[in-house]
Every structure is written in structure tokens, then in C-alpha cells.
Amino acid sequence: MQPTLQDLLATGADSATAISAPSRSGLSFGALRTLIADTLASLNSLGIGRNDRVAIVLTNGPEMATCFMACASGVASAPLNPAYRADEFEFYLADLNAKALIVEQGSHSPAIAVAVKLGVRLIDLVVADGAPAGLFTLQPRDAAGAAAAVNATDGKHGTAGGFAQLDDISMVLHTSGTTSRPKIVPLSQRNLAASAGNIRQTLGFSATDCGLNIMPLFHIHGLIAGVLAPLAAGSQVFCTPGFNALKFFAWMDEARPTWYTAVPTMHQAIVSRAAKNADVIARHPLRFLRSSSSSMPPQVIKELEAHFHAPLIEAYGMTEASHQMCCNPLPPALRKPGTVGLAAGPEVAIMGADGSLLPRGTALEHTGEIVIRGANVTAGYENNPGANADGFKHGWFRTGDQGVMDEDGYISITGRLKEIINRGGEKVSPREVDEILMDHAAVAQVVCFGMPHPKLGEEVAACVVLREGQSVTERELQAFVARRAADYKVPKKILFMAEIPKGATGKLQRIGLAAKLGLG
């Protein structure tokens, strides 16, 4: 029988360290399991149970990791980017139908005022002075409408308590869509546990491993690969406050890790400081380095492996797959740099435009859309029949990535079939930015698109046509977007044009626009 998260987290020895953090004592697996049970009991006492949505807005670190694990074990956790602006929080909290919001005690997040406005129950996460890394208690606020805060749900969400069952929803994330409205991706216990188990097996985690987590813990990458998968093997996870190239090697010296996972932009920043920190690398040799979320330049792979004397393992994941789909194997098995490796859990295939599965090979006729199916794949987007009709074909989930599978089964991504901008692993819906810019009084027409960037892979750009007689600067429009959207969504370059280039049918075409404008 497939395990639940509770089963996976039962692996580590009671006295072994599960969670650690800079300059703090560690939290044992026994204490972690007690914390999870206590947290669920606390939530249940507030009328919050299985499948109820609990939004989490916390800074990166050990409490974010343990709060996620506790919530995902018995309710539907909904981690949100703490850098969101009020408008974004209002959209996400309302769209999720959140029953509660967990924030740090003393936080001034704009999410708090939004939660009060929406009648979402506020719960403070309290960390005692000198507490081990990740240990906390929950304390409900006496917010106005406390009675209403045991929010009546829409009838779909129950209030059954205790640990979740396999088909209960454990995490709810949004993924950027080609339309302006982000799509809700519900992930079940089955999905998360399957993905964590796949990653654990692929990377050969054991109780002797320690992972240095620098990934944000409101993304699927950090939560599943950085935290849940290693803990499922009884490994230790060293939780940092978030990526900081200047502190990385000091953290490495303290944590004594055996591995870390990151996106290519982080790896590039790390490798630029590796030579100066050769002594740290020598003291704490890594078993491997892992990269996912966007493609890694081959030159950076060579540099990293030369400095760390360890293999860099490229993986391929996405939210709808609870992260990992493919991964290059560990030595001595064959690694193929530049590919995203072999199927690593789910079934992976290449589908032609007619819906047929294509044979292996790297020739043009073998190029198609990468599709997946398996226990880690979401059952479908919530309340979005159109997206589900488009996203699934013959039982396979369509990734939107174009690729090939060579004779050995290794997958190479050759392009994108969708308009989503991948900015260093942060996914941006161009339509969302379009709509913000269109609210500016001076803007008549706009189209946002991705333009190449040497480190991030892609950066956000926009073409703008102004209303007759109006004027505005690039900096003013960037500031306008920044007031309503997270910084990574703000266009780096804005081109003012008399007319936006269109395709043969007269439609605005984002894909390929950067090249047409000489930006790529």
C-alpha cells in the first residue's frame, strides 16, 4: 500500500536530527513527529480539518519547513510567497477559499489585513526564545469576527480531524497560466508521498545525508526535493533563511552537508565564489549537487563539478507533477549533461500533434510534447474544465514542453509550447502583467513576453502602445507594476511602439517576439 506523509516521516530515528538551522540547536525526528501531531490537534480544535485550506505566509527557514509538514499531514496546506503585494494576497486567499492564515507572530505582512477583510481566521506561529530549529506553537488571534473565522466552507471541504488519508488534498498551489488567471493545482497525499519517494530513491538518500536547503519554501521544488524527500529517508535538512551567495559557504561549513539542490541562477552565484572557498569545499565534500526548475548552461555544470569534485544531477519537475518527473542518475550510471535525464517516478513519453506517442530518437520527426502520467501527477486543475480538457490527452498530462527521448530513454527539452515566462525558476503569466499595465491611464495596448537572459534563462519584457497624447516613462510603468505585483513580475525592459507586431492571422504572438524585436 502506498504510504502517506505520516508514514514517510516515521522513518527517522527518534533521537536523530531532522531539522537544523544556522546558529540553532536541531529538532529531532521524535520531536518533529510530536510537533506535527500537536499542530494538527490545535488546528482541529479550531474547526479546521482534513481538506480545509490553510494558507501559510512565513519567511524561509526551519519553521516554514515544519509548519508545511504539519499542515500537509492533516489539512490542505497553501504556502504563499511572502513577497506578494496586497492585491496578490487578496486574489490567492479568496481563490483558495482559505479557512485560516498562519503568519509569524509580530508579522506586518499585507496578507494580514487582507485576511481580516475576507474573514479568514488569523493564526500566529509563535517561536519561544532558544527553541530548537522548527519548533513552534500556534496561537489564534482575537481578530474581529472570530466566530465567523471558523469560516463556513462551500460544502466541498470537510472538518474531519486527525491525519490525512491518501486521497485527501495536502497542498494547494497556483500555477501561472497562459490566461491571466492562475490555475489551482490540488495535490493529494498520494501525489506528495509518491513524489517524495521517487526523489528519495533517485538520489539514494539515507540517514547519513544532510541537505543544505537554500530554496524558497513556497515552491514545490524546495518543499518536496529540499525538505520532504530527504526527511522521508531519515536524513537531516539544514534550513537557511533563503539563498544568500555571501553566506552560502559559511552555512556549508556549519551544516556539513552531503548535497544541495538549487536553480541555475543560484548555482551560478555559488560557482563564482567557489574558488575563494576551496577550503570549505575540501572540508565538506558533497556526494552530489542537484539542479532543477530551469535549464542549466553546460559551462556552469563543468565549473561546478570542477570546483566541488562531485556530479551535478539535472532534474526536471513542475508543480502539476508534485515536482520531479525526470532526473539524471547518480554515478556510476550514465549521466548525460544537457538532458534532464530518465523518467524518475512517473511514466514519461513524447506525444505527437495527433495524440500518438512517438518512438525514441533525436531526429526532427521524433520531436513532440513531453507528457507524463503517474501517482505523483495531479488529478486535474480545480474548477477549470477548460484547462483540464487542454492539459490532459488520452490520460497523459501535457507539460507544454517540447522535447525528444533518445534511444537510451534520456529526455532533452528543445523548446516551449506555452507562453509562460520562466524567470530563473519563477513562472510568470504574461497575461497577468498585461492586465496590470492596461490599467495605466497612458497605455492603449500591451503585450508581455519572455526575452533571453544569460543567467535567468528568461526575463520579462513588454511592448507598449500609448494612448494618443499620453506620455509615460519605462521607469514609471515599472513602478506601476511593482506596486501591484511581486518584483520578479516587473518587466525589465519596456519597448514603446506605434504598433505591436502581429502574426499572419493578426493575433499578438508572444512566442518568438523577442527574436523579432532583436532581443534574443
Predicted regions and their residues:
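Conserved AMP-binding A3 loop
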Residues: G26-G30, F163, S170-A194
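AMP-binding/adenylate-forming catalytic core of the ANL superfamily
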Residues: Y84, Y260, G374, A379-G380, ...
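Conserved AMP-binding/adenylation subdomain of ANL enzymes
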Residues: A193-C210, I220-T258, A269-K276
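Gly/Ser/Thr-rich phosphate-binding loop
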Residues: P257-A262, V271-R335, E347-A349, D354, ...
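Conserved AMP-binding/adenylate-forming
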Residues: A41-D87, L96, Q105
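Conserved pre-ATP/AMP-binding loop-to-beta segment of ANL
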Residues: D14-S15, D142-H174, R181, G204-C210
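Conserved beta-loop-beta connector loops within the AMP-binding
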Residues: A349-V371, E407-D408, Q470-E474, Q509
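Conserved ATP/PPi-binding loop(s) of AMP-dependent carboxylate-activating enzymes
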Residues: L342-G345, S356-D390, V428
